[in-house]
Swiss-Prot record:
Its EC number is 6.1.1.7. The lineage of its organism: Bacteria, Pseudomonadati, Pseudomonadota, Betaproteobacteria, Burkholderiales. GO terms for molecular function: alanine-tRNA ligase activity; aminoacyl-tRNA deacylase activity; ATP binding; tRNA binding; zinc ion binding. Belongs to the class-II aminoacyl-tRNA synthetase family. It holds the Pfam family tRNA-synt_2c. This is Alanine--tRNA ligase. Catalyzes the attachment of alanine to tRNA(Ala) in a two-step reaction: alanine is first activated by ATP to form Ala-AMP and then transferred to the acceptor end of tRNA(Ala). Also edits incorrectly charged Ser-tRNA(Ala) and Gly-tRNA(Ala) via its editing domain. Disulfide bonds: none annotated. It is found in: Cytoplasm. NCBIfam families: alaS. One of its GO terms (cellular component) is cytosol. Consists of three domains; the N-terminal catalytic domain, the editing domain and the C-terminal C-Ala domain. The editing domain removes incorrectly charged amino acids, while the C-Ala domain, along with tRNA(Ala), serves as a bridge to cooperatively bring together the editing and aminoacylation centers thus stimulating deacylation of misacylated tRNAs.
Length: 874
């Protein structure tokens, strides 16, 4: 039974039992910053289990794409060296949200395994939590599993409810016993049943875990029965495939065998049992699907984990002798294996391939040097009998050659060498401290505040006649009063000032209280809902408790909101022009411009930029209303609002609809698209592999920019004596004229060289039968010197010649020696003799050599000594 059949039969079975088939969620968990990657089937249902989300179904089944690499759940170092560890895997699961419970969950599992998959019942063992008599009785009395194949597992991890058979989401919250199903590979494989001293052997392999959430655990450890118990099960697709295909290792199943053959093809390896091929086959799945879900190789967070996995795959290819990019070529093979089950992979094939290729090319530039240093260090360490690689060297490999620590550890582990992680961490921390010391932190960061939250009124108004000062800070410390000339932070109970958030810059403006005037230069958040107004008290005194009027700089805000609203329209347009893979990776919106970073693997063409501009300006011309609405997060996503990967959103979110764009956004915006006025992209470039950046301007800024371009166009046309509309053909004419003049100049230089050759030949001096000439040619370039040298050597027949010239304060030298004299006089030595006297050096062949110098005043004297130097050589 193929992997694809196993997957589809699982989903079809549970669909026939009234379950809704739910598509795999993204590998980047939505609305959960605590989790690096989706690592199990229950992640997308977490809020349902917690009771904070409701679905239109109470039974669900899924095949969930999962990754365990980095963070708490990290299998990376074992991948390729064991039979069942993977960075990427698929988790088959069925879920009950207050619907069925233990009995049905157990009966469903047994029916699927023994009837649908036709596994021999006598090969299956089960475990239950020691105190879960209910589950035990179902297995024994209803299913009919013999008592000798049912194992009770108690609290075997040193604490109450700390057990392999008791599942907890966290220290508090939903929890409950679980029942695991094991497959017995038979006596030919070493190992004992679960719960025995030999349980870590490979004979008994866990294939399915049935979790019964029936309690809520409080902070004191008390267990309270849940009003609606739930079921969460998980079965690794790769594991059950190995069982059903009668192989012992996951890497022997059909899907992996196809990928291993592809890895062997690209690395030109015949032996398919190499561990490195398994690593590469595993890693192409993780890397490809992470890129599909919007992760881009980078230096932090999810992007860094992706980069580590890519570079580990490259290193294993390098180990097999592959010295050029190969990894990206396997994407097509992966699409062939998994593209039907996951159409999003097939749709993103080109983008995934190009992102991987760019990352490969980048790492292949440094891997050879890095590996040479590491191999030499390991050889030296072994020679000295050492067992631990210096952490400072590991950090150098990380910092200079892009070797993640676990890649270095991987190489060392193969040679039974450890790495001094403490020294590595110390070096890393030193670098971070240096970077931190060099950085400048905003004044509002780290201020202690325990007062009321700030109420924001800036969506509706730019001025408040009265607000109360709730806190003042000078030099980072809370004060009761601020004096004239002091710079600090003012916190208000109410404000129209927008605090920097979501990429939008904070407002500027003024606070007034009697004769006190506080000029606000920036607004940031001290806490989530506490706004710090940064600036300087220009006059009067200001105290905590004072009533102030607050007025935002209206012109600056207007420019900022134009840019912010245009960013939304541009984001939508970029997705329309480039594809749905475009995702925001960063933004900065202020009064001057909008800067937008997004995922894309190639520079935008001029035509693509024009198309984006046309789409945005068409939205502006339609002059549609802007509409903001507060709604529950799930309702917002269901309505089509775009949410950013990895962002943490509140239960209720603000949905901004502007033109055809709909996004979650808490920023300030125009009332109608026409208020933006005009949109123009002014910069496009790359900031990292797979990340592009555009900068754009709007309104009067865009108008002034275009007026400036128009003025420069008219100026250029005037210089060339043409109308602006005739500028391009006129430039073509000028270029043709320049090329003709350059050609004529070269002809004249050649003619001059020929005439100079005749004149200079007469100046040659005979020294012991060899013609010797040293001369300075004013105004000659290197090409002229070389042509003159060729003519002189041809004319003098047997000669040693040095020619020099001065241009832009630098000396150019060329030396030539005819073939009959190179046994005694070498052109390289001759030119170096002269060059050293004019502040330079040079060299070349025995018959022709060049040099340069920086001291032109010494050239005549240096040339004058050539005759004596040659005489000393012959």
């Amino acid at each position: 039974m193929k992997v694809s059949d196993i997957r589809s039969k699982f989903l079809q079975f549970f669909e026939s039992k009234g379950h809704t088939v739910v598509r795999s969620s993204s590998l980047v968990p939505a609305n959960d910053p605590t989790l690096l990657f989706t690592n199990s089937g229950m992640v997308q249902f977490k809020d349902v289990f917690l009771g904070t989300d409701k679905r239109p179904y109470t039974r669900a089944t899924s095949a969930q794409r999962s990754v365990r690499a980095g963070g708490k759940h990290n299998d990376l170092e074992n991948v390729g060296y064991t039979a069942r560890h993977h960075t990427f895997f698929e988790m088959l699961g069925n879920f009950s949200f207050g619907d069925y419970f233990k009995r049905d969950a157990i009966l469903y599992a047994w029916e699927l395994l023994t009837k649908t998959y036709q596994l021999p019942a006598e090969k299956l063992w089960v475990t239950v939590y020691a105190e879960d008599d209910e589950a035990y009785d179902i297995w024994a009395k209803e299913v009919g599993v013999p008592a000798e194949r049912i194992v009770r597992i108690g609290d075997n991890k040193g604490a109450r409810y700390a057990s392999d058979n008791f599942w907890q989401m966290a220290d508090t919250g939903p929890c409950g016993p679980c029942s695991e199903i094991f497959y017995d590979h038979g006596p030919d494989v070493w190992g004992g049943p679960p719960g025995s001293p030999e349980e870590d052997g490979d004979r008994y392999i866990e294939v399915w875990n049935l979790v019964f959430m029936q309690f809520n655990r409080d902070e004191q450890g008390n267990m309270t029965p849940l009003p609606k118990p739930c079921v969460d099960t998980g079965m690794g697709l790769e594991r059950i495939a190995a069982v059903l295909q009668h192989v012992h290792s996951n890497y022997e199943i059909d899907l992996f065998q196809a990928l291993i053959k592809a890895a062997a093809r690209e690395t030109h390896i015949d032996n398919l049992n190499q561990n490195s091929l398994k690593v590469i086959a595993d890693h192409i799945r993780a890397c490809s699907f992470l890129i599909v879900d919007g992760v881009i190789p980078g230096n932090e967070g999810r992007g860094y984990v992706l980069r580590r996995i890519i570079r580990r795959a490259i290193r294993h290819g390098y180990k097999l002798g592959q010295k050029t990019p190969f990894f990206h070529k396997m994407v097509a093979d992966l699409v062939e294996q998994m593209g039907q089950a996951y159409p999003e992979l097939a749709e993103a094939q080109s983008r995934v391939t190009e992102v991987l290729k760019a990352e490969e090319e980048r790492f292949f530039e440094t891997i050879e040097n890095g590996m040479s240093i590491l191999d030499a260090a390991l050889a030296d360490l072994k020679l000295k009998g050492g067992k631990t690689l210096d952490g400072e060297l590991a950090f150098k490999l990380h910092d200079t050659f892009g070797f993640p620590l676990d890649l270095t550890q991987d190489v060392c582990r193969e040679q039974e060498i450890g790495v001094d992680e403490a020294a590595f961490d110390a070096a890393m921390n030193r670098q971070r401290e240096q970077a931190r010391a060099a950085g400048k932190f905003k004044m509002a960061a780290g201020l202690e505040y325990t007062g009321d939250k700030t109420v924001f009124h800036g969506y509706e108004k730019l001025e408040l006649p009265q607000a109360r000062v709730t806190a003042l800070y000078v030099d980072g410390a809370a004060v009761n009063a601020m004096q004239p000339g002091q710079t600090g932070v003012v916190v208000l109970d109410n404000t129209p000032f927008y605090a920097e958030s979501g990429g939008q810059a904070g407002d500027q403006g003024v606070l007034k209280a009697g004769n006190a005037v506080f000029a606000v230069t920036d607004t940031t958040k001290i806490q989530a809902d506490v706004f710090g107004h940064q600036g300087t008290l220009e006059g009067g005194a200001l105290k905590v408790g004072d009533a102030v009027s607050a007025q935002v700089d209206a012109q600056r805000r207007a420019r900022t909101v134009r840019n912010h609203s245009a960013t939304h329209l541009m984001h939508k347009a970029l997705r329309e022009v480039l594809g749905s893979h475009v995702q925001q990776k960063g933004s900065l919106v202020d009064a001057d411009k909008t800067r937008f970073d997004f995922s894309h693997n190639a520079a935008l063409t001029d035509e693509q930029i024009r198309r984006v501009e046309e789409i945005v300006n068409a939205e502006i011309l339609r002059n549609d209303d802007t509409h903001a609405e507060i709604m529950p997060f799930d309702d917002a996503v269901k309505s089509g609002a775009m949410a950013l990967f990895g962002e943490k959103y509140a239960d209720d979110v603000r949905v901004l609809s502007i033109g055809t764009s709909k996004e979650l956004c808490g920023g300030t915006h125009v009332h109608r698209t026409g208020d933006i006025g005009l949109f123009k992209i002014v910069v496009e470039g790359g900031v990292a592999a797979g990340i592009r950046r555009v900068e754009a301007i709007t309104g009067d800024n865009a108008l002034h920019y275009l007026q400036g371009l128009d003025a420069r166009l008219n100026e250029a046309a005037a210089v060339l004596k043409a109308q602006p509309s005739e500028l391009v053909p006129r430039i073509g004419q000028v270029q043709d004229q320049v090329r003709a003049l350059e050609k004529e100049l070269e002809r004249l230089k050649s003619k001059l060289a020929a005439s100079q050759g005749d004149e200079l030949a007469a100046q040659a001096v005979d020294i012991k039968g060899l013609k010797v000439l040293a001369a300075q040619l004013d105004g000659a370039d290197v090409k002229t010197l070389r042509e003159t040298m060729d003519k002189l050597k041809d004319k003098l027949k047997s000669a040693a010649i040095v020619l020099g010239a001065v241009s832009d304060g630098k000396v150019s030298l060329i030396a030539g020696v005819t073939a009959d004299a190179t046994g005694k006089v070498k052109a390289g030595e001759l030119v170096n003799f002269v060059a050293q006297q004019v502040g330079g050096k040079g060299g070349g062949r025995p018959d022709m050599a060049q040099a340069g110098g920086t001291e032109p005043a010494k050239l005549p004297q240096a040339l004058a000594g050539v005759g004596e130097w040659v005489a000393g050589k012959i």
